Amino acid sequence: MAKRKKKFSLALSSFTIIILLIFLLGIISHLLPGAKFVDDTIVNGSGVVGAKLHEVLLSPILGFADAVDVSVFVMILGGFLAVINSTGALETGIQVLIKKLKGNELALIPILMFIFSACGTTYGMLEETVGFYALLAATMVAAGMDTIVSSAIVLLGAGSGCLGSTINPFAVGAAVSSLPEGTQVNQGIIILIGTVLWLSTLAISIYFVMKYARKVKKDKGSTILSLREQQKMEKKYGKEEIAEDVSLTGKQKVTLILFALTFLVMIIGFIPWGEFGITFFDGFTGWLTGSSLGNWYFNESALWFLIMAIIIGVVNGMKEKKFVDTFVDGADDMVGVILIIAVARGASVLMKTTYLDNYIIYNAAELLKDVPGFLFAPMNYIIHIVLSVLVPSSSGLAALSAPIIGPLAGQLGHSVEATVMTLVAANGLVNLITPTCGAIMGGLALAKVEYGTWVKWAGKVVLTIAIANIILLTLFTLIF
């Protein structure tokens, strides 16, 4: 029997990586020119304010305040999933699905990735995907694959949609609304560019995920996961062999219908229907959550998941004490994920405190003024990759960059639409791999995949996507 190769794994935890990055930003703030102020207002691009020790130390703590809404959502999501798991419906449902797909499990991958990507391109699904990491981890492990496959389905699926945002209000919408008054933008061109970026990125992602999934399914020893990660994966998601007579009870079927309905309503709640002139959902759920479907955010979703957890508990005849204990235990399981999400926000907090974001974007704009036309899109893309590591929020980056880069593109005779989509695409690319994105770090923690392992596997995928993006964006910049 051939000896299994020892898998290399970067041992640094997610917390350590994020904290080291925050300290690095603090050091960088002292190496750049000092900022100039006029009447307590910074002269844009003049420099940065060196971070004080207490500002560096406090930034991860202040990240909690910045992430309180998503943290509460993730905590309640954990309680909801624990209630579902306690009924046995999800585990049995997965077993039934795998049994029916016997030999065709790989067909799930492109279908699921397309669904996630559709949510990404329409409303920027990212933090909302956290619960799916655990769900798909169980499914893919049962199907003979590993949690790299399940993580890639969620992250590259939703991420390809975010990268190629078409009508996403948190990316395209935020960027267009941040442009100075009078800047002309053709929404049709933006949707066209976004669609091409979305589908091309999705195709590349599906190819790499399918290739790896086939290899692991054929030979489990070919997994990129370290032995430690494999042990954690098996302990959390590994189950006994599926019984031949496995089937769902009537109560379990109802539970799974309610489970699917919960996520479906959440997705409908996040899609900005009013942006498309659709008023059908106006008034829906307003009496329950305070906001109609289409105007939801994390607070409304958290309330919805809490309500559905209670309903599922009642359907399954759970006693009050058992329900509360189960829900609290599930929420407790998410504490590590919540800490990672919150601490990751600390990098953005320190960026604002030191004006490092302001310095980078204004000096980047100066650099782009002298760039030849065919290099404008590639340089703009690279600049926004750097910015996105520091400001992973698509709406935050749009508010920072679009008012400066958009008009500059127009003045130089370049397409404003292609410039906006360059910003969006660069941010989407970085959010496939950056440690400053709490959703990535939290999702990988749930899947028992270490960040170093994800970077090792996804690096080639991200590089391929970046090259394709640059070629397409350069063509669009020259055409429009």
Where are these regions (language model features)?
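Hydrophobic core segments of alpha-helical transmembrane domains in multi-pass membrane transport
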Residues: 15-31, 74-82, 115-119, 157, ...
